[in-house]
Amino acid sequence: MPDIDLILGADPGRRRAIRTEPTQRRSTQRLDALLDAAAELVDEIGFDRLTTQMVAERAGASIGTVYRYFPDRVAILHGLRDRCVERFRARVAARIDEIRPETWWDLIVAALDASVDLYRDEPGFGVVHGDDRELSADGGEPEFAARMANLIISEFGEPADAETLRFRLGIALELGETLVHRAFSRNPEGDARYLSEARVVVREYLATHLEHASHPKAA
């Protein structure tokens, strides 16, 4: 069974955007309401025009409540991005757990499909996800690509060059995400041509570099 904890862990060294962490259920609900409001607004008007006052009004909260959790609009956007990233990783992990992958491609498809799903049903995801990508703890590839590489290695064994795997996986996921983003920029439900091409591009790019990962390694 794949070790999905490799996908779900917190980013090392990632600073939280939230000024005050909620400690009670009511506080958590209040914070979620603020982020929900921000997500709706960025879908409607884009992140450049978002203000703290808009978020307060949409959430039915006072401006003081907003500032309790976020010092400014940029922090709100970072908070929304953090939530999108957490939900994306949770969706990827759930898909992987459900399908029980037999090849490296099954893992990649799980990530691509999770991204498509969230573009469709997670407000704010298309605007925030993919901006300001975080690097992994070693300063190398984007954090999610590094996590996926570690999962592939855990499931299918160490390749001849793990560093190159992480590098190429980062490029592949970036290419796939760009095409998925373009698909939803053209059509709210996702342009099927771009979604199909995302799979083709990613698979063809990675195929020659993941020949070792055809079958899960022996326990």
Where are these regions (language model features)?
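N-terminal intrinsically disordered/low-complexity leader segments
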Residues: 1-29, 210-219
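Short, hydrophobic secondary-structure boundary micro-motifs
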Residues: 126-130, 161, 214-215
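Generic hydrophobic, amphipathic alpha-helix propensity
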Residues: 27-38, 55, 80-92
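Short linear capping/connector segments at secondary-structure termini
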Residues: 94-98, 128-135
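Amphipathic alpha-helical interface segments
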Residues: 37, 41, 58, 114, ...
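Amphipathic alpha-helical packing segments from all-alpha helical-bundle domains
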Residues: 89-90, 106-121, 133-158, 166-174, ...
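Helix-turn-helix
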Residues: 33, 41-75
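Amphipathic alpha-helical linker/stalk segments
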Residues: 83-107
